[in-house]
Amino acid sequence: MELKNYQKKVIADLQAYLYTLKQSANLAESWRNYWQQKDIAVGSGGVPAYKDNIQGVPAVCMKVPTGGGKTLLACSAIKHIFDFMPTEKPKLVVWLAPSDSILEQTLKNLSNPDHPYKQALDRDFGGRVQVLSKAMLLNGQGFSADSVQHILTICVLTFDSLRINSGRRYDRKIYQENSNLADFAAFYKNDAVLLEGTPETALIQVWRHLRPVTIVDESHNATSALSVEMLNNIYPSFILELTATPKNNSNVVSYVDARELKKENMVKLPVIVYKRNSRESVIVDAIQLRGRLEQKALEEEAITGNYIRPIVLFQAQPR
C-alpha cells in the first residue's frame, strides 16, 4: 500500500529529525536544529522545548488523527530509524499496545503476509521479519542472540504486561529468571546495563542489552510515573510515540491536520465539533443528543425494521 501524501510528509519529517540527531547527539540542540530548518522557533512563542523524559533517549511523537493510518506510519518508520543507527545494531522493536484488543489486532495484522503492514515491513527488510508475542518471547520461540542479528524482530506486548510498581515488578514474568533466554546472557557481557536485583536471564535484561527501538501506540495512555518507569526499564535506543491526542510531555515531531485526511478520502463521514464551557455541560449535552438520536432511531425502526443504536463515548483519564 502506497502512503498517502500526508503520511509521506510525516515520514519526511521523521527523516529530517533523524538527520539533525545524527549531526548532534545533544537532544535539545538537535530538536532546535530540526525546527529551525522549518523556520520555527523553539521555546517562547514557538514549539515547546525538547522534553528529556527518558534521559538521553531520543523520543518523538507523530500526532495523527484517528483513522489516519498510524500503524502503517509506524511500520514505514522503522527502517528509517534503523538506517540512522550503526549497521551492526540488532534490529529489535518493542511495540507497546494500550489494551488486549489492540494487542491482538496488532499481532494479527503485523503477522499477516497479505496485510499492508506486513507487506511494508517485508519490503523494507527483504522479508526477514518476525513478529513475536509475549508467550513466544518467554519460550524463546524464534528469539535468540543469533536471530536478532539478522532478522527484524518485533515484540508486541501491552503496557500492563510491563507497567507495575517497582516493589512488585517480579510478579511479571518478563522480570523473572528464564532459562529459555540463557544464550543471551552468555553472548552479552555488559553488566553495566543490567537492572539491579533482576536475574540476568530475564527478558527485560535481554532487552536492556539489545536496546530496542520502542513504539508506543496511543501514547497518551502512557504518561504516568509507572509508564515512565516502564520505558526506563526497557532501556530503549529510540522511542516513537503514536497518538491523535498527545500530552504536554510529548515531543511532537510531525502534525497532521484532520483536513488532510479528508483530502485523501480517509474520513468518510463529516466530523461535527461543538465547544462547551465545562465538563458537566459536555456530558449533559452529549447524553441529551444521544437521546434525540435514539428517538429518531426508534422511528426509523418502525418504518424499516432496522435499528441503529446511538452511543456516547467518554474518554477516561489515563492511570
Segments (PLM) and residue ranges:
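Conserved pre-motif I regulatory segment
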Residues: 1-63
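Short hydrophobic/aromatic beta-strand immediately N-terminal to the Walker A/P-loop
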Residues: 61-63, 94, 313
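Conserved helicase ATPase motor motifs in RecA-like P-loop NTPase domains
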Residues: 62-68, 218-222, 232-250, 265
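Motif I (Walker A/P-loop) of helicase-class P-loop NTPases
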Residues: 70-81
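Conserved Walker A/P-loop ATP-binding site and its immediately adjacent core
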Residues: 88-122, 158-164, 317
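Inter-Walker segment of RecA-like/P-loop motor cores
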Residues: 118-179, 192-194
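SF2 helicase catalytic motif II
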Residues: 161-164, 171-240
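Conserved interdomain linker/interface between the two RecA-like ATPase lobes of SF2 helicase motors
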Residues: 252-319
